[in-house]
Design a protein with these regions (language model features):
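Intracellular loop-helix junctions on the cytosolic face of multi-pass helical membrane proteins
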Residues: 1-13, 142-147, 162-163, 168-269, ...
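Hydrophobic core of transmembrane alpha-helices in multi-pass small-molecule transporters
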Residues: 22, 96, 110-129, 350-366
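Short amphipathic helix-loop junctions that connect adjacent transmembrane helices
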Residues: 33-54, 256-297
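Central cavity-lining transmembrane alpha-helices of secondary-active solute carriers
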Residues: 56-75, 162, 303-316, 396
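C-terminal ends and interior cores of transmembrane alpha-helices
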Residues: 91-109, 334-347
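Intracellular juxtamembrane helix-capping segments at the cytosolic ends
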Residues: 128-142, 364-379
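Glycine-rich segments within core transmembrane alpha-helices of 12-TM secondary carriers
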Residues: 147-176, 194-198, 390-405, 409
Length: 511
């Protein structure tokens, strides 16, 4: 006889879905943690050397496709089946990684358009993947185990992310497969590896049966699209989406802007020297040689975000299992704001890691709860649809945040541009030029490309790379770029507090 008081267990399909998610995230973060460097870092020899504004535009369109397409694909996953949707998405994701690897070499196509086109193919695949796997997962969970279930899912996501943070060092620094370190060939191998990891999910999809969504299987595509649009027009749902959009605008800058900020400004030399006890092979994977001396790469520093979540998110989910989801999210928002400011206001790698800890604690409380909240308030037969809405705040936030970050960082934060600005404003050579104050015209005005900016500044000033970096830090204070993002996060927290108070009066939104 079944004990009616027994807690529902997490079954085999639940764990298979989590493994599929882990491989997808490992492949994704193998690319994502290095994409900011590949796109615009002036001192990386194998990168594309695009501008911060170009990067912002690419990230904005990436976010639009990856996060807004699930508005449609969530309903399609409910209609046509989660497993079929995931299979289509995996093939598209593999194609996206291969396009990133090889389209750079297509004659007559600029680096900007080749990367943008390839990344949109990848984004399309991801947009089909998310509603499929999250819809399948939601049907494996009940109200009694949803907090722990979503916490485990978030834990698995970060296992993939954590491993994905270290793989680039093997391909880029150690130069696997005979490619010189940080060369175009090494970057290509990195992207091919992501395609290979993604292909493993094709095998895993054969190991379980599809989960019935509960939605109509005879409904036409037009009706699915109409239902998708009419459901999202609910004013209270739109208010929640707007609040979370502001929060994700702030959050994503740790992953999208912080890599460039670390590469430009953070001094991880003391941390690198403290790792001298590591075996030579491992040390070579977590320490890179830079003009400023041995440093810990930004992808390794930011891996602490995934590491902290791996060791803490399941416990955090257990601690908050009886907490109202909106209340837990509010606390998490406040912690993330503090962490962002601590991580962004320093040149010390040790203090940055402390900020990442605060940021990660906030993410542990907010990230899983956003999915749990929408799954709990979703009407029957609409879990895939509502979980497709999870991505909308990310899309809006990353779209606006990418545009803002590109504009702000190009003018106030990028070291190569600030080096050119210093040459224009404070050196005899620069004072003979007629610069109009527009950062975009600095290269043409001075006749110095961004890739040579720091070398020329050192030549004019007589300073070494460390001293030249400090000169720019104290002259232009690039850490102020984090203030607008923190301010937007504070607005989101205040709005969520008000929404949470009002939701107590709505039985269908109070979760």
């Amino acid at each position: 006889m079944t004990d009616p008081t027994a807690k529902p267990k997490l079954g085999r399909t639940f764990w298979t879905l989590n493994i599929i998610e882990m491989w997808e995230r490992l492949a994704f973060y193998n690319l994502r943690v290095m994409a900011p460097i590949y796109i615009m870092q002036a001192d990386n020899p194998g990168g594309l050397h695009l501008s911060a504004t170009d990067k912002g535009t690419i990230y904005a369109w990436w976010a639009i496709v990856q996060s807004f397409l699930p508005i449609v694909t969530g309903g399609l996953a409910d209609r046509f089946g989660y497993k079929r949707t995931m299979a289509f998405s995996v093939f598209t994701i593999i194609a996206g990684y291969l396009c990133i690897a090889f389209m750079r070499d297509v004659p007559g196509v600029s680096n900007y358009w080749s990367f943008l086109t390839a990344i949109l193919v990848l984004a399309t695949g991801t947009a089909f993947f998310k509603p499929g796997i999250q819809g399948s997962l939601a049907h494996q969970l009940t109200k009694e185990n949803s907090s722990v279930g979503w916490g485990v899912f978030y834990w698995v996501v970060n296992v993939g992310a954590f491993v994905g943070h270290f793989l680039p060092s093997l391909f880029l620094l150690k130069g696997w497969f005979g490619a010189p370190a940080n060369s175009p060939e090494a970057w290509r191998n990195l992207f091919i590896a992501s395609a290979a990891f993604s292909s493993l999910n094709l095998l895993l999809l054969l190991t379980f049966k599809d989960v019935p969504s509960g939605a109509s299987k005879t409904e036409g595509i037009g009706a699915v699209l109409w239902r998708t649009l009419t459901n999202i027009a609910e004013p209270r749902l739109l208010a929640f989406i707007a609040i979370m959009s502001c929060f994700w605008l702030m959050m994503f800058q740790l992953w999208d802007l912080q890599p460039n900020f670390i590469a430009d400004w953070v001094d991880s030399g003391p941390m690198a020297r403290s790792l001298g006890w590591l075996p030579a092979g491992i040390r070579q994977s977590v320490i890179e040689q830079t003009p400023r001396g041995p440093m810990v790469p930004q992808n390794v520093l930011l891996s602490f975000n995934a590491f902290f979540i791996i060791i803490g998110v399941v416990g955090m989910s257990w601690l908050t299992r009886r907490m109202r989801t909106l209340s837990a999210m509010l606390i998490g928002m406040c912690m993330a704001i503090v962490g962002l400011l601590v991580a962004g206001w320093t040149q010390s790698a040790w203090i940055l890691v402390l900020g990442v800890l605060g940021f990660s604690l906030g993410e542990m409380m907010t990230g899983p709860k956003k999915s749990e909240y929408l799954a709990l308030i979703a009407p029957p037969g609409k879990k895939g649809l509502y979980l497709g809405y999870v991505n909308i705040p990310v899309g809006i936030g990353v779209f606006l945040g990418s545009w803002l970050a590109g504009t702000v960082y190009q003018r106030f934060g990028e070291k190569a541009n600030l080096a050119l600005r210093y040459i224009a404003e404070y050196t005899p050579m620069g004072q003979t030029k007629s610069w109009d104050g527009n950062m975009a015209s600095l290269e043409s005005t001075l006749g110095i490309p961004r890739t040579e900016a720091m070398a020329r500044l050192q030549e004019f000033s007589g300073l070494d790379p460390v001293a030249a970096t400090q000169l720019l830090w104290h002259t232009y204070h690039p850490h102020v770029i984090w203030l607008p993002f923190a301010a937007i996060g504070i607005v989101a927290a205040i709005a969520l507090f008000i929404f949470g108070r009002m939701a107590r009066k709505w039985s269908d939104m109070n979760a």
